[in-house]
A protein has these predicted regions:
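Bacterial N-terminal signal peptides
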Residues: 9-19
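Surface-exposed interaction patches
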Residues: 140-158
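Edge beta-strand at a domain terminus
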Residues: 30, 37-40, 121-123, 129, ...
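Short glycine/serine/proline-enriched coil/turn segments at secondary-structure junctions
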Residues: 88-91, 148, 162-165
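N-terminal secretory signal peptides that target proteins for export/translocation
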Residues: 1-4
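Central antiparallel beta-sheet cores of small beta-barrel/beta-sandwich binding domains
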Residues: 45, 61-142
Length: 177
């Protein structure tokens, strides 16, 4: 027989399960500033307008080096971005990025290239970050989060895995135009 305390705990759990939207229950914290998508079928509804504030030119620091990033405004169902990591004035690598509307939500797709423009991924492959949630001035893709500090600055956090060790890397962005 269940005690009244057990019934109360079960009641609260059931209320939380129904009161919290499914898209919120479909994610969990991965690192201090990033989330992972636990249920790919429960992504938040979103459009490119929700992330249009990314458009523009940015520069900043990441991985002990400097970077430049440019995002075009939304058009034709996508936003196109370019990222370049520099060390001592030399290109380390490039990224070509696409934010697209798919499955009623957003995905950020990335292809990486060495300084000589040889691809990291196979021809058809890319890295996909699916939208997990919006939280105030933050947009969280699975393993990658952008926090808008103000109109001129944002911070991004990306999950990196090396030899089984998971860590979070911070990138500080400043708008240049």
């Amino acid at each position: 027989m269940l005690s009244s305390r057990s019934v109360s705990i079960v009641t609260v759990a059931v209320l939380i399960a129904f009161a919290v939207p499914e898209s919120v229950r479909a994610q969990s914290l991965r690192t201090e500033h990033t989330y992972k998508l636990d249920d790919p079928d429960s992504r938040p509804t979103a459009s490119l307008e929700d992330v249009s504030w990314l458009a523009g030119s940015w520069s900043g620091e990441a991985f002990g080096s400097t970077f430049e990033e440019v995002w075009n405004p939304p058009s034709a169902g996508s936003m196109v971005g370019l990222w370049k990591l520099l060390n001592d004035g030399q290109v380390v690598f490039y990224e070509i990025m696409l934010i697209v509307e798919e499955e009623g939500s957003l995905s950020l797709k990335v292809k990486h290239f060495n300084a000589d423009f040889t691809a990291w991924e196979d021809k058809e492959d890319y890295v996909r970050f699916r939208l997990v949630k919006f939280d105030g001035d933050a947009v969280h893709f699975s393993g990658l989060s952008f926090y808008r500090i103000n109109e001129e600055e944002m911070h991004a956090f990306i999950v990196m895995t090396h030899e089984g060790e998971v860590r979070e890397e911070k990138m500080v962005y400043r708008r240049t135009r």
